[in-house]
Structure formats: C-alpha cells, structure tokens
C-alpha cells in the first residue's frame, strides 16, 4: 500500500468532529422523537442532511489540513456508504422476521448506530495499529475482505426467512434475561408487574412464560442485539476497506462515523426501493474484491 498522510490526533480536530456528530444526532433525535413511520420523502431529506453534515466536515478537513487529506476522507466515506448496503439488507431481514413496525425501526437503528460508534473506534484503533507489525498484515486484511465477497456470492437468498431464534445474540440475551414474546410499545425491557398486567388481557391468555424475573426483554431488544452483532461482523469488511484508503486513525474513524450516522435514513430509502435495487449487492461484491486487490497491490 502506498504511503498516505498521517494527521494524528489534534484537540481542535477532535473537538470539531465531536461537535458536528453530537449536533447532528441531537437534531435527528429531536425530529424523530415520536414513534411514527418514516416516509420515503422524509428519509430522503434526512439522508441528504447527513450527507451535508459529512461533507461539511470534509470541508473542514480540506481547509484545516490539505486537499489530499480531504480526498482520503471522502474516499473512505464513499467506501463505507457503499459497503453498508449489504448490512442494511441484512437488517431488513431481521426486522421482517421479528415483525417490527416501521414506527419502531428508527429506535432500534438509533441505538444500533450509537453502539456502532463505540465498536468502530475499537476496530479502527486495532486495525490501524496492526499495520505497525509488518506488511503481511495487509495480506491478512485482503484475505478477510476477499473471503467476505466469496461468502456473499455463495450465500443463499433466503429473502429474510432465516430463523433468528438460532442467532447467537438471541441465545445470549435469552440466557441472561427472561423474554416476553410480544412488543410493548417501543420498550426494550418491561417490568414483571407490567408483564403480569399484559397477561391478564384476553389476547395474551395463550402466552406462557418459560422463565420469570423482575425484568423481561422484548422482541425489540432481541432485534437490537442481533442488529448490533450484525454490525460488528460487518466491521470486519468495512474497516479494512477504509484502511485501504488511509492508515490514519482519525481520517478512518471520522469518515466511517459520518457515513454510519446517515445509515438509519438510508435504510428507509433502501427498504422502499428494495425491488428496484437488485444489482446493489453484486456491486458491493465487486467493490470488496477491488478493496482486497488494493490492499496487496
């Protein structure tokens, strides 16, 4: 891999990055404070909003550092957005299996994104740090990315019909917390007292709790756990891909985070246009092979 600029961690840069990210999140959270379905028009607006936020930070990188640094930032941003498509399709399958209403999906995606912000930081610091061990690390990363592309080619198109009750995250939550099998508003957890009140309702007479406890996890939390796990697995593709653009941790992390923050709105666009985007996954596979080649070229 060719040498790329290393800008390090400046207090001013970190402060500006944090300001942009938190301000955008607060505006987004306020706008979506109600559990209402998000229309295609609204999703498009908020996708453009987050693109504008990400582009504005790219402008800061251009002015504060250099055009080359800004170009690396935008290249990494584009890679992250493109590679996120497959992860979003996987999330659609999770929501479909759990029967999550569109009004509640934004809440799951919001908390999922916050988790991704933390996990990406860990992955980026580890990933960029590994390159100090030697050039062979690039071949390991290239193999991981190429393997992901091969797995995407070979996987069966189950159209969201996977049984997610066998998912490791589902079993992990089930092991530690009793489950209540029905949605209770947008709650991730419900108290035992609330569950007992729910069980008194005629439509819930058939429900038999396998375990009892003070607190119960709802299907919405199970959905969040699986989405979060899916994102961690996805990071094994996306982090090496963006590191193929730049080894600098601040460039890598900032471009990935601003791309991720716009994914919730992008999800609703892809969900609405899913049938018209049948070639997107193939494009992602091609991009993964390109990234694998770039890592070793």
Language-model-detected regions and their locations in the chain:
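Multi-pass alpha-helical transmembrane bundle typical of ion/small-solute transporters
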Residues: 1-297
């Amino acid at each position: 891999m060719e040498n790329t600029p290393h800008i390090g961690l400046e207090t001013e840069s970190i402060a500006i990055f944090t300001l942009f990210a938190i301000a955008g999140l607060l505006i987004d959270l306020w706008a979506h404070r109600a559990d209402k379905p998000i229309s295609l028009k609204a999703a498009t607006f908020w996708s453009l909003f987050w693109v504008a936020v990400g582009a504005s930070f790219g402008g800061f990188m251009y002015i504060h550092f250099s055009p080359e640094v800004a170009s690396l930032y935008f290249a990494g941003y584009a890679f992250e957005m493109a590679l996120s498509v497959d992860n979003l399709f996987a999330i659609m399958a999770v929501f479909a299996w759990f029967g999550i209403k569109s009004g509640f999906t934004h809440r799951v995606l919001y908390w999922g994104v916050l988790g991704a912000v933390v996990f990406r930081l860990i992955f980026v610091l580890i990933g960029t740090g590994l390159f100090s061990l030697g050039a062979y690390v690039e071949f390991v990363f290239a193999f991981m990315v190429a393997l992901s592309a091969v797995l995407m080619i070979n996987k069966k198109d189950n159209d969201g019909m996977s049984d997610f009750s066998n998912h490791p995250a589902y079993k992990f939550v089930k092991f530690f917390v009793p489950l209540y099998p029905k949605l209770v508003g947008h709650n991730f957890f419900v108290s035992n007292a609330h569950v007992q009140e729910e069980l008194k309702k005629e439509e819930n007479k058939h429900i038999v709790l396998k375990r009892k406890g003070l607190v119960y996890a709802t299907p919405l939390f199970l959905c969040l756990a699986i989405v979060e796990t899916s994102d961690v697995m996805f990071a094994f593709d996306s982090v090496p891909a963006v590191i193929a653009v730049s080894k600098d941790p601040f460039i890598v992390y900032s471009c990935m985070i601003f791309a991720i923050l716009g994914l919730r709105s992008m999800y609703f666009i892809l969900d609405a246009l899913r049938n018209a985007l049948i070639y997107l996954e193939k494009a992602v596979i091609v991009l993964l092979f390109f990234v694998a080649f770039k890592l070793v070229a």
